[in-house]
Amino acid sequence: MSNSNRVLKLGLPKGSLQDSTIELFGNAGFHFSVQSRSYFPSIDDDELEAILIRAQEMAHYVELGAFDVGLTGKDWIIETGADVVEVADLVYSKASMRPVRWVLAVPENSPIKTVKDLEGKHIATEVVNITRKYLESNGVTAAVEFSWGATEVKPPDLADAIVEVTETGSSLRANKLRIVETILESNTKLIANKSSWDDPWKREKIESMALMLQGAINAQGKVGLKMNAPESALEAITAMIPALRQPTVSHLAHNQWVALEVIVLEREVRKLIPELKKAGAEGIFEYDINKLID
């Protein structure tokens, strides 16, 4: 098959990660259109074919070759034991740009204080294999039952404890649960089928995708600033800029003035711009950054 007719099959996570994943791909330059109730998003790239599927199943289907590449959590790779290529860490989740945690949680008034107190108890969770390995590593024997959902409501009547994923802990607190320990920290990963990874055309396509996705993540929460300043104020201005990289400085046609360009955290801009103005900067211009490639 000629490269002009080749297609890379991409698995996208359906559910809690779907919206943030589609947004991330958009920032990376891949624009999907998802129709209501459809599992087959369209995309502005003739070399990509996408399907929405639950993250829990993604690693299994990538291993089988149903997908060349997909996005799922480190947790589900471990849980399923899938033999796949882990191409890139993409640290984002449903509501933030940080990892999630699988935690052992119990009712607030539970006497359970450590994992050792779980001996002979009942635990409900979606990650049965991860939980069993955790208990085994701590020398604890307990019954681990698969939970089909609404895991937070099961203690104390249906389970003594749960192992549940959390991003902020708010859902656990709302259900009057207390975190005992963190079992696993997980983030989204771009994974590939081993045979697909060995295919030069597919590997190049996957690596390019990983580069652009990582660039979009790197740009989150950052903006660019451009400004002009008298050369006499350059030292003072560069000293006050909390730059992620050294600012780019260019001499203007008027040899007593310079142009500066720098990348900073967006949350620092509201304090920084007034200080730059006081220091002598002019024509200060803020712009969005979609991708930041290291």
Swiss-Prot record:
CDD domains (alphabetical): PBP2_HisGL3
InterPro entries recorded: ATP-PRT_HisG_long (IPR020621), ATP_PRibTrfase_cat (IPR013820), ATP_PRibTrfase_HisG (IPR001348), HisG_C (IPR013115), N-reg_PII-like_a/b (IPR011322), N-reg_PII/ATP_PRibTrfase_C (IPR015867)
Pathway: Amino-acid biosynthesis; L-histidine biosynthesis; L-histidine from 5-phospho-alpha-D-ribose 1-diphosphate: step 1/9
Compartments, record wording: Cytoplasm
HAMAP family with a match to the protein in the record: HisG_Long
GO terms (BP aspect): L-histidine biosynthetic process
Species this chain originates from: Chlorobium phaeovibrioides (strain DSM 265 / 1930)
Name recorded for this polypeptide: ATP phosphoribosyltransferase
Entry-linked Pfam families: HisG, HisG_C
Enzyme Commission number(s) of this protein: 2.4.2.17
Keywords: Amino-acid biosynthesis, ATP-binding, Cytoplasm, Glycosyltransferase, Histidine biosynthesis, Magnesium, Metal-binding, Nucleotide-binding, Transferase
Gene label: hisG
Similarity comment: Belongs to the ATP phosphoribosyltransferase family. Long subfamily.
Activity regulation (record text): Feedback inhibited by histidine.
Cofactor(s) in the UniProt record: Mg(2+)
GO cellular component annotations of the record: cytoplasm
UniProt function note: Catalyzes the condensation of ATP and 5-phosphoribose 1-diphosphate to form N'-(5'-phosphoribosyl)-ATP (PR-ATP). Has a crucial role in the pathway because the rate of histidine biosynthesis seems to be controlled primarily by regulation of HisG enzymatic activity.
Catalytic activity field: 1-(5-phospho-beta-D-ribosyl)-ATP + diphosphate = 5-phospho-alpha-D-ribose 1-diphosphate + ATP
Molecular-function GO term, any one: ATP binding
